[in-house]
């Protein structure tokens, strides 16, 4: 490398280090802002729809497409989950056909919801539906990189041996006083005994170790990350 080139690069390196330091420091912890969306109406199995709505709206999906009763109709291939075809309000008497556990809508219906994503079970033939998929949390570096990039993560947990589970949103992290993550459980606000925050105390902190192992009798299942809204829709 010619001497002048080396000098220029050294100068650029010093400048980059000087300007990048504050950004690095700023992302030692971060909490994303998203609208809390609990399962709508009388649904018992819409945690996937609730977590999906929170993230899709944050990333720019119109509420008319992201609302939970609309997701249920699209994912389950049924009608009557919303009060009217143009409404985002769930039916007062929710039909049983509308209330079944499924993955988030952008996972189940990629042709309808134009988002890209990865899972921690992508190495398996059936991805998140593979029988071998289980206990696959994101490592700390990857998880914090997602939050720093402004992308929440969907994590799933389940009872040991169960084929069904529960989804939550990871919207923040901190290293003080130790590695921990801020999660939003759409089925409840601040659980008793937890350190909570948010306008409704909807987010609660877990140590990263607890996040990996599971909590409240549940074990970690699979994480959905790298969630991005595509620029164009393919029909």
Model-derived regions, located:
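Hydrophobic h-region of N-terminal signal peptides that target proteins for export
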Residues: 13-21
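Conserved active-site-adjacent core of cysteine acyl-enzyme catalytic domains
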Residues: 26-35, 72-234
């Amino acid at each position: 490398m010619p001497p002048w080139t080396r000098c220029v690069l050294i100068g650029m390196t010093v400048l980059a280090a000087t300007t990048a330091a504050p950004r690095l420091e700023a992302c030692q912890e971060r909490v994303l802002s998203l609208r809390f969306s609990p399962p709508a109406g009388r649904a018992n199995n819409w945690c996937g729809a609730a977590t999906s709505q929170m993230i899709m709206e944050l990333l720019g999906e119109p509420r008319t497409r992201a609302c939970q009763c609309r997701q249920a109709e699209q994912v389950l291939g049924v009608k009557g989950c919303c009060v009217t075809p143009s409404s985002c309000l769930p039916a007062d008497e929710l039909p049983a056909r509308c209330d079944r556990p499924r993955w988030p809508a952008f996972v189940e219906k990629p042709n309808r919801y134009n988002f890209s994503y990865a899972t921690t079970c992508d190495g398996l033939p059936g991805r998140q539906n593979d029988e071998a998929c289980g206990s696959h949390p994101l490592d700390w570096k990857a998880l914090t990189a997602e939050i720093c990039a402004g992308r929440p993560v969907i994590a799933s947990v389940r009872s040991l041996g169960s084929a069904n589970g529960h989804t939550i949103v990871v919207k923040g992290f901190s290293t003080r006083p130790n590695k921990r993550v801020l999660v939003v459980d759409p089925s409840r606000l601040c659980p008793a005994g937890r350190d909570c925050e948010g306008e409704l105390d909807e987010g609660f902190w877990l140590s990263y170790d607890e996040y990996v192992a599971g909590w409240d009798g549940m074990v970690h299942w699979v994480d959905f990350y790298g969630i991005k809204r595509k620029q164009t829709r393919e029909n």
